C-alpha cells in the first residue's frame, strides 16, 4: 500500500470519527415554545383583525431587516434573545405561513399581544389569541409535527422543549386599572390577584397536561414605573404609580408560592419562576449604571414621558435607542431586554427560582 493511500485512509477515518463525535447542533437543539402577551409576541397579531399590533414603523427600526415584524420592540424581543443565548433559531409565529416542514421542529411562538390570564382581559383589542386558543393551536402544532416525525418523537420533542410563559401584566393594566372596570368594582386588588393566581394555576396545569416539562414563568415587572403608568397617574417627578406597584407586589409573591406548590404536586421542578420585577427594577431604579440616560421617558410615544397612546409613525422618536430603557409606553428596548435575559441565564435565586436557565440547560443535557 502506498504512503499516499495509507495517509488518505487515516485522514478519512479520523475525519469520520471527528464528525461522529461532534455535537449535532441542529438535531440536538431542544425545541422552544412561547406563550403569552405582547412582551413575547413575535408577530401573530399581524395575521389578526386587532388593534393590538406592531406592524408599522418605527417598530423594528433596529431589527436586522430594519422593518416592523409585529414585535413590540425596536429590535429583538425576549424570545429572540433567549433563542440566541441557547444557540437556537428564533421561533416563528404559529400563524406564519413560513412555519412548515423542518422549521416546525425548532418550536413555535403562540403569543398574542393584549391577552391576559382572564378571558375578559383585552376585549378592547378585538380579535386576539387568548390563552385557551394558544393551547388549541399547540395541540394542532403537535398533530402537524406527528405527521413529520411520528407521535412518539413528537412527544419526546415536546417533553424535552423549553417553554416560556408570560402573562399577568395586561390583567392589571388593561383590565383592573382600565377605565370603567367591572373587575375593579367587584373586588379589591388583593381579591383580584388571588383570582388571577387561581386561574393561572389552571392554565399551567393544562400546559403540563399538553406535555410541557420545563416552563419558565415570568411574573409582572414594576407595573407602576412604565411610562404609560407615569403619564396616566400624573407623576410629577417620575415617581412610580403606587397602586400599580402594589399590584405587582401582591401578585408576584403569590405566583412564586403557586409555582412551588405545583412543583411539589408534580414531584419535579417543571415550573421555573423568573422574577420580572427584579430584572426590570435594576435598570429602572439605576438607569445610568446600565448606560441608559432615562428609564422614565419612552423612546417612542407622545405626551408626558412619551407615555400616552401608542408608538406610531407620527410619534416623537429618540435617535439613540440604547439610551432608553423603554421603547414605547409599555415595552423595553432591545438593550433593556438583553439585561433581563442576562439575569434569566445566569441570575441568582433573587431573579430565578429555583434555578437560572444556564443551570437548567446544564442539568437537562445530562438526561
Swiss-Prot record:
GO CC field: extracellular region
GO molecular function terms attached to this record: hydrolase activity, acting on ester bonds
Any Pfam family the entry gives: Lipase_GDSL
Signal peptide residue numbers: 1-28
Residue positions with a glycan: 119, 356
Biological processes, Gene Ontology terms: lipid catabolic process
Assigned EC number: 3.1.1.-
Taxonomy, superkingdom: Eukaryota
Name of the protein in question: GDSL esterase/lipase At4g28780
Active site feature: 38, 328, 331
Subcellular location: Secreted
Family affiliation: Belongs to the 'GDSL' lipolytic enzyme family.
Organism name: Arabidopsis thaliana
Gene3D superfamilies: SGNH hydrolase
InterPro entries in alphabetical order: GDSL (IPR001087), GDSL_Est/Lipase (IPR051058), SGNH_hydro_sf (IPR036514), SGNH_plant_lipase-like (IPR035669)
Record's keyword terms, sorted: Glycoprotein, Hydrolase, Lipid degradation, Lipid metabolism, Secreted, Signal
Amino acid at each position: 500500500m502506498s504512503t499516499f493511500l495509507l495517509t488518505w485512509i487515516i485522514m478519512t477515518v479520523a475525519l469520520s470519527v471527528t464528525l461522529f463525535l461532534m455535537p449535532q447542533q441542529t438535531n440536538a437543539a431542544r425545541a422552544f415554545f412561547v406563550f403569552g402577551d405582547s412582551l413575547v409576541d413575535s408577530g401573530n397579531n399581524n395575521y389578526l383583525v386587532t388593534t393590538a399590533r406592531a406592524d408599522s414603523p418605527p417598530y423594528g427600526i433596529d431589527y436586522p431587516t430594519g422593518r416592523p415584524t409585529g414585535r413590540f420592540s425596536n429590535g429583538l424581543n425576549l424570545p429572540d434573545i433567549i433563542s440566541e443565548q441557547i444557540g437556537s433559531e428564533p421561533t416563528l409565529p404559529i400563524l406564519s405561513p413560513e412555519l412548515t416542514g423542518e422549521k416546525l421542529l425548532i418550536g413555535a411562538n403562540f403569543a398574542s399581544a393584549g391577552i391576559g390570564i382572564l378571558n375578559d382581559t383585552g376585549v378592547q383589542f378585538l380579535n386576539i389569541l387568548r390563552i385557551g386558543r394558544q393551547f388549541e393551536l399547540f395541540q394542532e402544532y403537535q398533530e402537524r409535527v406527528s405527521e413529520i416525525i411520528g407521535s412518539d418523537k413528537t412527544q419526546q420533542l415536546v417533553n424535552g422543549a423549553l417553554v416560556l410563559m408570560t402573562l399577568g401584566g395586561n390583567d392589571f393594566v388593561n383590565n383592573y386599572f382600565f377605565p370603567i372596570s367591572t373587575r375593579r368594582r367587584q373586588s379589591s386588588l388583593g381579591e383580584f390577584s388571588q383570582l388571577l393566581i387561581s386561574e393561572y394555576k389552571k392554565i399551567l396545569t393544562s400546559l403540563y397536561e399538553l406535555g410541557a416539562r420545563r416552563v419558565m414563568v415570568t411574573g409582572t415587572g414594576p407595573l407602576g414605573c412604565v411610562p404609560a403608568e407615569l403619564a396616566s397617574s400624573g407623576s410629577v417627578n417620575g415617581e412610580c404609580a403606587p397602586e400599580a406597584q402594589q399590584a405587582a407586589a401582591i401578585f408576584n409573591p403569590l405566583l412564586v408560592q403557586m409555582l412551588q406548590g405545583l412543583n411539589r404536586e408534580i414531584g419535579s421542578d417543571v415550573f421555573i419562576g423568573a422574577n420580572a420585577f427584579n430584572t426590570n427594577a435594576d435598570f429602572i431604579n439605576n438607569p445610568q449604571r446600565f448606560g441608559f440616560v432615562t428609564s422614565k421617558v419612552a423612546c417612542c410615544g407622545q405626551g408626558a414621558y412619551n407615555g400616552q397612546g401608542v408608538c406610531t409613525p407620527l410619534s416623537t422618536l429618540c435617535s439613540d435607542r440604547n439610551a432608553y430603557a423603554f421603547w414605547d409606553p409599555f415595552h423595553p428596548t432591545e438593550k433593556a431586554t438583553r439585561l433581563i435575559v442576562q439575569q434569566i441565564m445566569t441570575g441568582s435565586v433573587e431573579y430565578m427560582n429555583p434555578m437560572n436557565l444556564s443551570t437548567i440547560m446544564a442539568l437537562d443535557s445530562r438526561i
